[in-house]
């Protein structure tokens, strides 16, 4: 909104307030006299006859007046026409030059930004002068900042007359007095009033008055009681729940390790499922996702992932790819080594079976692959006995390859012959039962008894002297049927009974095995063959141990007694206990 008025009165009129509440200001307070214009005496003064209100200001109408004003020396002197402008309208109607600069519509001064133009309008064309309120001060301020800055000068207290001299004397005294490195009264008072004790720490005070909390279990120390309490919690073993998964961990340290391994990199997804498009951090989480209830039934998921492979389209980063390649290389190496060991075991087994030359027809011969052997160190499997150390504790030397090969063959023969008398007791004590009878007994009892545990028995304080039961030694209608009877009573031998003592059965020779195939010893021919082989293998091992003992005695120049009726060979055998060697 703009208004134009004509006046000849040199005195500045008061601001005009319109009916709608807008305030209008006069920008010039004096008349400008042009050189060609008549003097004030010649021109009669004009009165303010009309005051009209128009629409938005059109700068083309007053362009000539603005140019005339800018040519004059004083920026505040205008022609007879004075432009009265509203403050809001002045800020809204801003002219922009073609080069992008802003210029004032009153004084035609260019500015680079709209902010600088606004500051110019408020500072020069719309400012309100205010005088200082202090008596005797004629300072005029045009902005609020100038007024506040000037008021601070009156608020400052006046210094005393001797303040400067006192400051100089105080500085000299402070330089002369030696400063002690001890806390002052204020620091000691704060320490006594606001000190806190933390269990598990030692509280000390430094020279500067700070409180130090030292841990009793580690050299860690802090200056904050809260941090000290958090550190002491790390040494406690109280169970704590994980915030993310709810898993219970023992202590804060274990909980932090769980977080670092599981939840730290949850935001970084490296493995992507091709079915549900979920991403996982590690291969364990990814396989757990795939091996869900419906994972094996989903045709879109490759089933080879259950065997260590990743499905097609899986996004894997470089580090994880290198780890997978190294893991697969190790799997190939382990697979190759396993094949070599299996081939070697197959060759040894075929060689032993060929040497035994046992022809039992259609019956199944017990090979002793799962048998337990009684050793001085307890029950051992055939593979553990086979892989014993090559170091000989008697002579302190290592055996040669030829001796080791012979020893391994003899041990393989011994594996095929478990404890003789245990199988004989099982044959004579256990009644003949069929699969149907066993099922009926299980249905009547409605519970299953756990199998016998083989190993150290804490009740008797030693290893029980028995071996696992072979399938061929059980009396059954057909040799091919193999079933486990959970109700079979475990038979323990007496401790004073020699497990390797030969019985009254006929001992067959390895060269005359075929002669006993047609014979009828016991309840089953196949079981008698195994019993005879066990007896032969046990006797061979006893003879070998006797030879080794006599060789050691010969080295010590030990003279055996003469062969007469009063010899003490039996006493010597009891001393060395040849029969208990297994």
Swiss-Prot record:
Keywords: DNA-binding, Metal-binding, Nucleus, Repeat, Zinc, Zinc-finger. It comes from the Eukaryota. This is Heterogeneous nuclear ribonucleoprotein C homolog. SMART domains: ZnF_C2H2 (SM00355). GO terms for biological process: regulation of transcription by RNA polymerase II. GO terms for molecular function: DNA-binding transcription factor activity, RNA polymerase II-specific; sequence-specific DNA binding; zinc ion binding. It comes from Caenorhabditis elegans. Its main location: nucleus. PROSITE patterns: ZINC_FINGER_C2H2_1 (PS00028), ZINC_FINGER_C2H2_2 (PS50157). Residues 1-21 are annotated as: Disordered.
